[in-house]
Amino acid sequence: MTVTGIIAEFNPFHNGHKYLLETVEGLKIIAMSGNFMQRGEPALIDKWIRSEMALKNGADIVVELPFFVSVQSADYFAQGAIDILCQLGIQQLAFGTEDVIDYQKLIKVYEKKSEQMTAYLSTLEDTLSYPQKTQKMWEIFAGVKFSGQTPNHILGLSYAKASAGKHIQLCPIKRQGAAYHSKDKNHLLASASAIRQHLNDWDFISHSVPNAGLLINNPHMSWDHYFSFLKYQILNHSDLTSIFQVNDELASRIKKAIKVSQNIDHLVDTVATKRYTKARVRRILIYILVNAKEPTLPKGIHILGFTSKGQAHLKKLKKSRPLITRIGAETWDEMTQKADSIYQLGHQDIPEQSFGRIPIIIKNERLN
């Protein structure tokens, strides 16, 4: 049986994600972000609810990406997630993309030319953001073309880099329905952006989200719930440069901007430059919010949930892999657990996110 890995945020889970799970074959293992997202924002609903939605709609195992994988630029996000999935025995990685190209060929390009490609990046002017530099690199060394806003395609290129030497097959699936950033409601497969934008339209949500009650009946979180905490952290921090990725220039810009910013969008707009993209600034603000410093990664893999089929696979791995099914007196990952505690502060109805929680188990008969 083919073991397929999928890297996801499911923020929130929607019909497009269900389509992806129905399209790929075999046992499906999801490496999913926790309570903070790659583009620097809190999850709309907590990681346990998102895991349950995935398991009820085709996923067999959901594992958690540690904080310092979830909240990172595309290359580090991809590398950390693929490293975890490879430990779980995946043979292929499936992902949605706007442009279906031969990503397998790009793995071979990177395997042969990684040193030259990395050296080329260092020759590009500092006024370019890292994503802009990366696009230029792929254009020069592999002839990859970029057309407009294609975030999934760009992430696919990071998957290709991270898969070098891993002996896994990349399985791109053409993205269906609305574009990634589209707010349009007139699609059967609406985007996560549209769903977050129209949360009060229950008819739209019920048609766009499988098991919509799980989304509708749980707290909906955003930066608005944490902005006052962030402001306190910035104004009272003695040395912002001790925070991960904060240099003197950014520390100064952030300290000045917070005094005149009324919300997160205003703050990000004020701090961002050509060099410091809005996504990067948002991630850095998350680091400040949770007081993240030197990045460390846990050895164990935190299991958020599984089906009967997934449980059978995990039993084969448990003697040779450090699988964590319950966080007790001993921590799994201190940084992720601290971030979970801060996420909880945003709403009184968010339950405990780490200590004592056990995996969600969905019984099914799909054991063949």
Swiss-Prot record:
<keyword id="KW-0436">Ligase</keyword>
<dbReference type="GO" id="GO:0005524">
    <property type="term" value="F:ATP binding"/>
</dbReference>
<keyword id="KW-0067">ATP-binding</keyword>
<dbReference type="GO" id="GO:0006400">
    <property type="term" value="P:tRNA modification"/>
</dbReference>
<keyword id="KW-0820">tRNA-binding</keyword>
<comment type="function">
    <text>Catalyzes the formation of N(4)-acetylcytidine (ac(4)C) at the wobble position of elongator tRNA(Met), using acetate and ATP as substrates. First activates an acetate ion to form acetyladenylate (Ac-AMP) and then transfers the acetyl group to tRNA to form ac(4)C34.</text>
</comment>
<dbReference type="Pfam" id="PF05636">
    <property type="entry name" value="HIGH_NTase1"/>
</dbReference>
<keyword id="KW-0547">Nucleotide-binding</keyword>
<feature type="binding site">
    <location>
        <position position="96"/>
    </location>
    <ligand>
        <name>ATP</name>
    </ligand>
</feature>
<dbReference type="GO" id="GO:0016879">
    <property type="term" value="F:ligase activity, forming carbon-nitrogen bonds"/>
</dbReference>
<dbReference type="InterPro" id="IPR014729">
    <property type="entry name" value="Rossmann-like_a/b/a_fold"/>
</dbReference>
<protein>
    <recommendedName>
        <fullName>tRNA(Met) cytidine acetate ligase</fullName>
        <ecNumber>6.3.4.-</ecNumber>
    </recommendedName>
</protein>
<keyword id="KW-0819">tRNA processing</keyword>
<keyword id="KW-0694">RNA-binding</keyword>
<dbReference type="InterPro" id="IPR008513">
    <property type="entry name" value="tRNA(Met)_cyd_acetate_ligase"/>
</dbReference>
<feature type="binding site">
    <location>
        <position position="175"/>
    </location>
    <ligand>
        <name>ATP</name>
    </ligand>
</feature>
<feature type="binding site">
    <location>
        <position position="152"/>
    </location>
    <ligand>
        <name>ATP</name>
    </ligand>
</feature>
<keyword id="KW-0963">Cytoplasm</keyword>
<comment type="similarity">
    <text>Belongs to the TmcAL family.</text>
</comment>
<feature type="binding site">
    <location>
        <begin position="7"/>
        <end position="20"/>
    </location>
    <ligand>
        <name>ATP</name>
    </ligand>
</feature>
<dbReference type="GO" id="GO:0005737">
    <property type="term" value="C:cytoplasm"/>
</dbReference>
<dbReference type="GO" id="GO:0000049">
    <property type="term" value="F:tRNA binding"/>
</dbReference>
